[in-house]
Amino acid sequence: MPHIVLTNVSDFNSFYNKFKKEVLIIKNEKDQTNTIIRFEEIFSNQLKNIILIKTIVIENTNQPQTYYIMAMKKNNQITIRLDPLTDPKNKTDAVKISLANIAKQYKKIDPAISIGKTNLEQYLL
């Protein structure tokens, strides 16, 4: 399962508080195709240790995939992964890019955050 672990996290909820709806459009000139990644809504649990981000991905005019990205806080770490209940069947490049984008947004908010364990290195560059 694709995941990213962020370490040295001091303020988990800053992302929740600063979240804005966003649409990423990735153009592939070679194939002349577009990929759309849309971050729609964000939810937090009562304990404020889990955040869910509703995400929609459309690739090459295929059926859209709707799923939630889960960010879980444990100690000074955050694990970013796909929510198991809405896990998309096709873990395409766009799905993996959406996870990496959330990690990049956390790093933008807090530059002291480091990337720990991940199987998405190529999407974090």
Regions found by a protein language model. Name each.
Residues 2-7, 12-77, 81-125:
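Ser/Thr-rich, low-complexity intrinsically disordered terminal regions
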